[in-house]
């Protein structure tokens, strides 16, 4: 079989010929790993099609080049593992954001203790500059080849493919099923690191074999790798799951409620502050507060399309022989609220806002702290308006998003997602909705990109992606335009002409999930939340028992003006109490000793360790008030102190 594969071996000749004739400098051509031709990414092994448009070279340090590099590194990882552990079966190994992984069926799961040996073998393969060879064979030949190697996972994949030629890639004595593209040889991987191990079910199905997944990353040079590893260490320090325990915010009990949050007192206070702020901001902007039930009959979910398109993510229960769905979204309830009476065009838009608890089934393997849960609260709003009001309403929502992102000091960018393969509604409605989103964004001169095919099943959407303090990207806000559900639920309004018309609906969530947003904020601020949001803003510490009465008096003064304050009058060493307050990331620490008692003042320290010095209680209250107000000025909003 090996000789049959050899005779189908394709070389890099055509790709290299193009590069040599392209007029590029020798140094530039060294970094080229492929090309973009007619919108397709092709490596140097793939025969060139008839060139009808511009051919764009892909360099190793470009986004496409980096993806090729990591995909190739995944093959090197698999080759190294097979060399060291010959009985291991290989499954899949794609590139992913910031790295790659490979899944193995091993006699025992891999552990980090295996990494040094695997990395050494990978480095040996890299040092030999082994070329990646592209091979095309028939489906029957591919089945025969992988069956002879007892690679059952590859056989299963091949059986699921349509008849025709199958593409393989080979480095040395290791051959893998793969479409490519890949870098020219193994020595293009200049820097890599194995990161972690995890369990992963074959094809993501919990009924299938549990595989051992090795996560890793690779970069074109060691400097980029070092920067990334430093960022990873910083991310570990900021991990919201770690900080959540340390700051008494939240916890999980996966044995009894997987993917559901238990809020501790500090976390519940922080969440309440955030939710109260959201309610006030929505009321100021013309929204009405509403709330719908948790359970709705299955017929409503069938009517909305959720039962057909989203059933696998929903929970159902039976009550008195009727099937009910636990809501995964709030839109159905909001449409029913709208329908309680007939609206005039003068009443539009109707803006409904709900901090709605929803449930969505996520597989246990993807649950991740607050960032991926099964029960969460959406800051969910639905705006029902006339088609001619649509653009202005979208602009107002984007403005709201901009204000909130400024408040939390997030940079952001906009992505518009278009119609997915699995969708409902007419072509005309989709075109109209997509056009409205694009026009609204362009009208306020904001840059955006298009993500084809990633819209909701009922309409296109705007996704707002933010960058946190250490450069990581998170998707937060979503704005969706929907002509379909108003039609399905027969929403109407009486127009200026006295006739009934169908409105359009905007689905939008700015934070998306309160739980997820708090998780992101925790990591963004490394647990040191801004003063206005911190559960405990001030901690009063006494030096001896003699200061206790005055400390209690200061405590009452601060409470009276709305400052969230704690009091520590324990008979402990002052240094210990200060350190404890700093670890709790309390913004202000007030020390009251004999001198402060005599002057009826407080000694002000910051959580950073800086000592501001002596202040009167009145001066300190003003300091805290200004600290709370400052972020809201940046966000273009007002802050009510108490």
Curated annotation (Swiss-Prot):
NCBIfam families assigned to the protein according to its UniProt record, in alphabetical order: thrS
Cysteine pairs bridged by disulfides in the record: none
Protein name, entry field: Threonine--tRNA ligase
Binding site for Zn(2+): 331, 382, 507
Region listing for Catalytic, in residue ranges: 239-530
GO molecular function annotations of the record: ATP binding; metal ion binding; threonine-tRNA ligase activity; tRNA binding
Entry note: cofactor: Binds 1 zinc ion per subunit.
Enzyme Commission numbers on file: 6.1.1.3
Organism: Lawsonia intracellularis (strain PHE/MN1-00)
Family of this protein: Belongs to the class-II aminoacyl-tRNA synthetase family.
GO terms under cellular component: cytoplasm
CDD domains: ThrRS_anticodon, ThrRS_core
Keywords: Aminoacyl-tRNA synthetase, ATP-binding, Cytoplasm, Ligase, Metal-binding, Nucleotide-binding, Protein biosynthesis, RNA-binding, tRNA-binding, Zinc
Role according to the record: Catalyzes the attachment of threonine to tRNA(Thr) in a two-step reaction: L-threonine is first activated by ATP to form Thr-AMP and then transferred to the acceptor end of tRNA(Thr). Also edits incorrectly charged L-seryl-tRNA(Thr).
GO biological process entries: threonyl-tRNA aminoacylation
Protein location: Cytoplasm
Catalyses which reaction(s): tRNA(Thr) + L-threonine + ATP = L-threonyl-tRNA(Thr) + AMP + diphosphate + H(+)
InterPro entries: aa-tRNA-synt_IIb (IPR002314), aa-tRNA-synth_II (IPR006195), aa-tRNA-synth_II/BPL/LPL (IPR045864), Anticodon-bd (IPR004154), Anticodon-bd_dom_sf (IPR036621), Thr-tRNA-ligase_IIa (IPR002320), Thr/Ala-tRNA-synth_IIc_edit (IPR018163), ThrRS_anticodon (IPR047246)
Cofactor: Zn(2+)
Upper classification of the organism: Bacteria, Pseudomonadati, Thermodesulfobacteriota, Desulfovibrionia, Desulfovibrionales
Assembly information from the UniProt record: Homodimer.
């Amino acid at each position: 079989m090996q000789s049959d594969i050899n005779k189908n071996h394709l070389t890099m000749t055509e790709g290299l010929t193009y590069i040599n004739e392209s007029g590029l400098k020798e140094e530039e051509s060294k970094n080229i790993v492929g090309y973009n031709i007619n919108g397709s990414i092709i490596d140097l092994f793939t025969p060139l099609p008839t060139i009808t448009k511009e051919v764009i070279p892909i360099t190793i340090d470009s986004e496409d080049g980096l993806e090729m590099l990591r995909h190739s590194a995944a093959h090197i990882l698999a080759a190294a593992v097979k060399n060291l552990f010959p009985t291991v079966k290989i499954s899949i190994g794609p590139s992913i954001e910031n790295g790659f992984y490979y899944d193995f069926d091993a006699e025992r799961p891999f552990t980090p203790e295996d990494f040094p040996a695997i990395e050494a073998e990978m480095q040996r393969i890299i040092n030999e500059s082994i070329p990646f060879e592209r091979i095309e064979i028939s489906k029957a030949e591919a089945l025969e080849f992988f069956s002879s190697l007892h690679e059952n996972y590859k056989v299963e994949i091949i059986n699921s493919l349509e008849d025709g030629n199958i593409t393989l890639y080979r480095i040395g004595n290791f051959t893998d099923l793969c479409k490519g593209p890949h870098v020219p040889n193994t020595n293009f991987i200049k820097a890599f690191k194995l990161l972690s191990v995890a369990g992963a079910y074959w094809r993501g199905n919990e009924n299938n074999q549990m595989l051992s997944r090795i996560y890793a990353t690779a970069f074109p040079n060691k400097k980029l790798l070092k920067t990334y590893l430093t960022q990873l260490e910083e991310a570990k320090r900021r991990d919201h799951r770690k900080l959540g325990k340390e700051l008494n915010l939240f916890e999980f009990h996966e044995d009894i409620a997987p993917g559901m949050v238990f809020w501790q007192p500090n976390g519940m206070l922080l969440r309440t502050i955030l939710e109260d702020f959201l309610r006030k901001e929505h009321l100021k902007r013309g929204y009405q507060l509403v709330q719908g039930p948790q359970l709705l009959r299955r017929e409503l979910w069938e009517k909305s399309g959720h039962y057909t398109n989203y059933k696998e993510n929903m929970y159902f229960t039976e009550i008195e022989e009727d099937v009910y769905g636990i809501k995964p979204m709030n839109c159905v309830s909001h449409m029913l609220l709208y329908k309680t009476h007939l609206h005039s065009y003068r009443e539009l838009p109707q803006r409904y806002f709900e901090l709605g608890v929803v449930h969505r089934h996520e597989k246990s393997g993807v649950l991740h702290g607050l960032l991926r849960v099964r029960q969460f609260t959406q800051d969910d709003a639905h705006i029902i308006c006339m088609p001619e009001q649509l653009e202005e309403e979208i602009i107002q929502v984007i403005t709201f998003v901009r204000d909130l992102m400024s408040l939390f000091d997030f940079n952001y960018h906009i992505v518009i997602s278009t119609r997915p393969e699995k969708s409902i509604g007419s072509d005309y409605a989709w075109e109209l909705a997509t056009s409205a989103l694009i026009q609204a964004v362009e009208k306020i001169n904001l840059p955006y990109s298009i993500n084809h095919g990633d819209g909701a099943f009922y309409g296109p959407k705007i996704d707002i992606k933010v960058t946190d303090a250490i450069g990581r990207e998170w998707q937060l806000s979503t704005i969706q335009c929907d002509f379909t559900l108003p039609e399905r639920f027969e929403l109407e309004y009486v127009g200026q002409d006295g006739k009934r018309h169908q409105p359009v609906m905007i689905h939008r969530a700015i934070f998306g999930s309160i739980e997820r947003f708090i998780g992101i904020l925790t990591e963004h601020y490394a647990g040191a939340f801004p003063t206005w949001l911190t559960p405990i803003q001030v901690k009063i510490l006494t030096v001896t028992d003699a200061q206790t009465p005055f400390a209690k008096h200061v405590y009452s003064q601060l409470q009276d003006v709305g400052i969230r304050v704690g009091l520590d009058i324990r008979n402990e060493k002052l240094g210990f109490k200060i350190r404890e307050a700093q670890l709790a990331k309390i913004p202000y620490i007030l020390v009251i000793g004999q001198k402060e008692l005599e002057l009826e003042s407080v000694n002000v320290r910051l959580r950073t360790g800086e000592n501001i010095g002596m202040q009167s209680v009145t001066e300190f209250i003003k300091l805290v008030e200004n600290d709370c107000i400052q972020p809201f000025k940046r966000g273009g909003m007002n802050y009510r102190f108490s």
